[in-house]
Amino acid sequence: MNKALFLCLVVLCAAVVFAAEDLQKAKHAPFKRGAAGAAPCFCPDKVDRGDLWMFRGDCPGGYGYTSDCYVWPNICCYPH
């Protein structure tokens, strides 16, 4: 019984370590909606649509965004 519990503990620890490693390798963990990309959003002063990022204070870097507007508690980032 003790060996089985020890083995379960080792497997659980290994799973946690590998899961944490995968999260560290990720460039960014966005709350970007939609299976094919972000949900569309529209700002009052823009003609085209932007990308809706949920629960963020600013647009993430590395995606080429140059402007934004707040759709509380989310942010709409441009250009698409």
From Swiss-Prot:
It comes from the Eukaryota. One of its GO terms (molecular function) is ion channel inhibitor activity. Residues 20-31 form a propeptide. Residues 1-19 form the signal peptide. Its main location: secreted. GO terms for cellular component: extracellular region; nematocyst. The keyword Chaperone does not apply. This is Kappa-actitoxin-Avd4i. InterPro entries: BDS_K_chnl_tox (IPR012414), Myo_ane_neurotoxin_sf (IPR023355). Disulfide bonds join C41-C76, C43-C69, C59-C77. It comes from Anemonia viridis. Blocks Kv3 voltage-gated potassium channels. Reduces blood pressure. GO terms for biological process: regulation of blood pressure. It is found in: Secreted; Nematocyst. The lineage of its organism: Eukaryota, Metazoa, Cnidaria, Anthozoa, Hexacorallia. Keywords: Cleavage on pair of basic residues, Disulfide bond, Hypotensive agent, Ion channel impairing toxin, Nematocyst, Neurotoxin, Potassium channel impairing toxin, Secreted, Signal, Toxin, Voltage-gated potassium channel impairing toxin. Weakly expressed in the ectodermal tissue from the distal and proximal tentacles, body wall, and oral disk. Belongs to the sea anemone type 3 (BDS) potassium channel toxin family. It holds the Pfam family Defensin_4.
